[in-house]
Amino acid sequence: MSVFTPLERSTLEAFLAPYDLGRLRDFRGIAEGSENSNFFVSLEHGEFVLTLVERGPVQDLPFFIELLDVLHEDGLPVPYALRTRDGEALRRLEGKPALLQPRLAGRHERQPNAHHCQEVGDLLGHLHAATRGRILERPSDRGLPWMLEQGANLAPRLPEQARALLAPALAEIAALDAERPALPRANLHADLFRDNVLFDGPHLAGLIDFYNACSGWMLYDLAITLNDWCSNTDGSLDPARARALLAAYANRRPFTALEAEHWPSMLRVACVRFWLSRLIAAEAFAGQDVLIHDPAEFEMRLAQRQNVEIHLPFAL
């Protein structure tokens, strides 16, 4: 189970008291998390999720709270931070920054179809539309410079075939980092995977885990999302799912010609980002009782993205 900081019941009860949500009925750790400690918390007045933030600078946490408030106010199904009776949203528990949020209904969709991807495309378009007019600035701590640094560090330890795949991808990232094209920007979720979306029947009911959120190119966020939701087990893209996601997104925000030009490379960049972070996690947590996602999944996806046949619709 990926709970890095276990909790005693009495400690949790004392922490929850200022929210005035009634007595604690039950709580349990959430196994799916791979970076933070998360708990389902059942109180007299409802169901909640408690997050202890294990990674990232504490000074960034007000950004996440403000972003979730903005998205909640715009009607997106997100888990905004609850306040105590004194108005506190960000607190500390067992020495870690802690947030209490409503628990959203629904379940993860492990085998999405075109309808699910359409819903996800519309959601991401809504998220970008809600923030592009007033972007809350926060550079990603796993952006292009991070990819270049970590790629260079990891490459010598990779098998020859993997190094041969990574080297041209890093060269492409270096060129993109130097160019910094004027692609449209907004706030990004930057981790919109299947395990961060909840469906209640056929309807999308929630978007969770914003702890990689940042500001940046909307196209990059779209590439991250499509790479997970529309990939087959061999890493190739499923045309029906991909076109459904892109069309729904484009209904919220039409694409530009510059975005169409950079689309294939952005899909590759998004693969590299998660291939590297998974390789790092696999080394750091080897032998520990922590959920580790398979790095090979994104190695396969990067190999499949060398030729991209799914283009952006309605590019102007």
From Swiss-Prot:
InterPro entries: Aminoglycoside_PTrfase, Homoserine_kinase_II, Kinase-like_dom_sf, Pseudomonas-type_ThrB. Its EC number is 2.7.1.39. Keywords: Amino-acid biosynthesis, ATP-binding, Kinase, Nucleotide-binding, Threonine biosynthesis, Transferase. It catalyses: L-homoserine + ATP = O-phospho-L-homoserine + ADP + H(+). One of its GO terms (biological process) is threonine biosynthetic process. Transmembrane segments: none annotated. Belongs to the pseudomonas-type ThrB family. This is Homoserine kinase.
